[in-house]
Amino acid sequence: MRYMATYDLMETLRNTNQWLGATAAALGSYPATALAPNPFFQMMAAWGDVTERTFHRMTVKPDWGINTVVTKDGRERLVEVEKLVERPFGDLIKFNAVGRAPRERRILLVAPMSGHYATLLRSTVNSLLPEADVYVTDWHNARDIPVSEGKFDIEDYTLYLVDFMRHLGPDINVIAVCQPAPLTLAATAYLAELDPEAQPQTLTLIGGPIDPDAAATDVTDFGRRVTMGQLEEMAIQRVGFKYSGAGRMVYPGLLQLAGFMSMNAEMHSKAFADQIMRVTKGEASDHDKHNTFYDEYLAVMDMTAEFYLSTVERLFKDSEVARNAFVVNGHKIDIGKVTDVAVKTVEGSKDDITAPGQCVAALDLLTGLPEEKKASHLEPGAGHYGIFAGKSWRNNIRPMVLDFIDQNAGTHAKQAEKKRAEKAKAKTAPAAAKAKAEPSSSDEGGLPTRIPV
């Protein structure tokens, strides 16, 4: 079948490299090699160890690894991950701190669907969990979704976000990280028009390409240079028979990873060379800085072909969100209809993926939003990863975002309480009606309960 051979070829190459690494590690670790007065075998074993781990991580979904959290009362509590909404292409999950009362701050982290799993936001979740109830969009690997589940493009993605926001209520504070920023803005505008009472309380857009033409990067240059026909021929493949999604057209995560690494090839090459030397000297460990970062960075997932292609064509080439011309399910969204959601943008001055200017463009589109509900921040010296997971996030951006949420807490909380009360009433009403409708023992069949004496 067309494109399936190339998908299986990539998987074969990955598998072969993993096997070569394991073989080299085994050969270099034989006790007899210690007799050779030469570090060659030690270096071969180290190369094999690093290579095997690297190629193995590419197909493994990482665990969240968030087992406990220290709350404000100083107690360490267990953390459980609960699925609130389950869908074929992604779930809405909540991190429950066992025994902790619900927090006033409720935060929905919209994870990017750009080749990595939602666990890329692990440190972000960790930093917010002591301060808030945290919810995350957990997107699924397209290779594991049967073709029978249908398509999933940027319109479907937007409608998923709309449903998740509706489920969580109007006192939710949404933080969109990178890729989903324009679609999260569109979802908020969709609710502003069609279901105003379900709008989130605040919306924070972190390093998202709202207007890709505002500042050029390698990503935007690639989008302009390549035609959609070329992109479909070069990037789209069909999932092989090894996975549940056999036959589904996807943009493979391995291709996305290759693109990411080529942008900083010299840095990655040095990082792996240094790690091989550390393993040789016995200085490396399972959870050292290199392995902690690359175990997550190398774990990639496939995206549906229609999602990837529609992202490039409609968001980058046609700039539909930037032009306020985005259409969802036949409905043209007007971002100017957002009037009651406080919006903040965050950018990094050294972001080479979403350059400064691309994200802050969202504020110009919000023509119906009062100026006092708009805010922006440019973090000096921060790169793309740093603005949501690095030192800049922990020390500067996180406290600023939490303050922004607190400053804009208010009427939405009252709306949320009202909606929850209505939901609870709706749940109890059928049970009460059923109990009322059931005949009592005194009128069963119209017969008396006692025989008169």
Stretches with model-predicted labels:
Residues M1-M43, W47-G48, P170, A187-E306:
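Alpha/beta-hydrolase-fold enzymes
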Residues M1-R75, K418-V453:
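N-terminal targeting or regulatory segments adjacent to alpha/beta-hydrolase or S9 domains
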Residues N67-I145:
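Short, surface-exposed "cap/lid" segments of acyl-processing enzymes
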Residues D144-P146, D156-N173, L185-A189:
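Conserved acidic catalytic loop of the alpha/beta-hydrolase fold
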Residues A176-T184:
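Gly/Ala-rich beta-loop-alpha elbow adjacent to hydrolase catalytic centers
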Residues V338-T339, T345-E347, D351:
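Short beta-strand/loop motif that positions the catalytic acidic residue
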Residues D352-Q358:
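Conserved alpha/beta-hydrolase "acid-adjacent" motif
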Residues H377-N396:
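Catalytic histidine-centered segment of alpha/beta-hydrolase-like enzymes
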